Amino acid sequence: VLDLGCGSGILAIAALALGASRAVGVDIDPKAADVAFESAALNGIGADRLSVYAGDVLSDKKLAARLGPGQNRVVLANIVADVIIPLSAKAGEFMTPDGVFLTSGVIDGREDEVRAALEANGFAVVKHLERGGWHAFRGERR
């Protein structure tokens, strides 16, 4: 599992708690790694199962190479549409051929843009959920 924009690491930690063997998080905020490791420790998860990196996967090729190109069955991004849209062009590089890109954090009025970006970047949107003005998408590689 790869969590793009991991923040506190909550999605990666949840994935590990639900059975993922390993998770990797990345965030542009250098403080996110410390927070994610602290959150993981509080949930009994060690650094042997969770890795977290600071940086921008859109501009840092070395970081992108460290994130396991072609190795992640699931890529997560719970972040604003302005970030998900450009990430949709990059997410497929990190995924296995049968990979899934789960996005959330999209506010009302931006869902069509996110769907279009996912579809333009090789994802079939197989599920779209909306609750309380927030949208989430499940994109599968075509």
Q: Where are each of the predicted segments found?
A:
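Conserved short alpha-helix immediately C-terminal to the canonical SAM/SAH-binding motif I
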Residues: 31-35, 83, 110
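A short acidic, Gly/Pro-enriched loop at the edge of an enzyme's catalytic core
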Residues: 62-74
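ADP-ribose/adenylate-binding Rossmann-like module
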Residues: 98-111
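Short beta->alpha hinge that forms the Motif I/post-I loop of the SAM-binding pocket
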Residues: 27-31, 79, 106
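A short glycine-rich, Lys/Arg-flanked "PGG" loop and its adjoining helix->strand segment in the class I
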Residues: 85-100
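Core SAM-dependent methyltransferase catalytic element
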Residues: 124-126, 130-142
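Conserved SAM/SAH cofactor-binding pocket of Class I
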Residues: 1-57
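A short SAM/SAH-binding and catalytic strip from SAM-dependent methyltransferases
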Residues: 73-85
